[in-house]
Amino acid sequence: MGWVDTPSETFVARHDVRDTADAERVLTQLELARTRLEQRFQADVGELEVVLHSSLAQLDAAQPWVPLARRLTAPAARRYVVGWAGQREIHVLCPRLLAHRASNVEGSLEMLMLAPAALLSRRYVAASHPKLPPPATPGRIARWSRWAWLVEGAAQWLSGQTRHVRPAVARRLREGPKPDFPPSRTDAMLLGGTIFDLLAREEGDRACVTLARGPHPDGPIRALEVAFPRSLRHTEEAWRSHLGRLGE
């Protein structure tokens, strides 16, 4: 099957001809997400190409950082590492493959289908933090390791994935060691959004956007101390209680 292009107002999708209808739905999702993101971020990411890959091998070959990120991610969240947001391109599995990767638990399919919006959200967050990827240079990846919980968590919250994360969080708590606070890069894809979910409950959406946008010149710990107006120890206790409720 050949590749074709499907345009929308601010995106162009490249995809297998079999995926034309799905590409149109992805573009609709992205245009709606972009409207919301532009209301919250001052960054301009310009026109973006969306590449819908028809196999995992194709995605990994096009974006070598993706298989590495998958290996660095906790097992409970690896199925959700399905793309990468570059400077001018978003690479993601096509919807039929996203659906195939979903588990039988509630919320898995919904999280995967929101992956394009999550990747676009990640691009907007990254644009507000110019020292983070993209591009995926060694120095930027090293900085991302410290800030992964913010980048991935903000993308999850902004795209709506946090509404569907409960079963995956429960699996992570059952199968893995006690998570770090803030979540390490291994847990960022899955647990980063729970920090934003807790912040939204306590301080409102505006506080979440402020945390996502930055800047945070004094580092991740100080960023959390500013976002949650109390000691870091009390915030960690509240977060672990929040995780416990999600894992029930």
Predicted features, each with a name:
Residues 4-22, 96-101:
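Acidic/histidine-rich, surface-exposed loop or edge segments in extracytoplasmic proteins
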Residues 17-32, 106-111, 115, 145, ...:
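Soluble non-cytosolic domains of exported or imported proteins
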Residues 37-53, 127, 131-137, 168-170, ...:
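Surface-exposed patches in mature extracellular/periplasmic domains of secreted proteins
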Residues 178-248:
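Pan-zinc metallopeptidase signature
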Residues 57-63, 164-165, 218-223:
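Secretory-pathway/luminal and periplasmic proteins that interact with or process carbohydrate-rich
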Residues 18-72, 106, 113, 124:
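Zn2+-dependent metallopeptidase catalytic core
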Residues 75-165:
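Zinc-dependent metallopeptidase catalytic helix centered on the HExxH motif
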Residues 34-41, 116-120, 124-132, 158-163, ...:
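Sec/Tat-exported extracytoplasmic proteins
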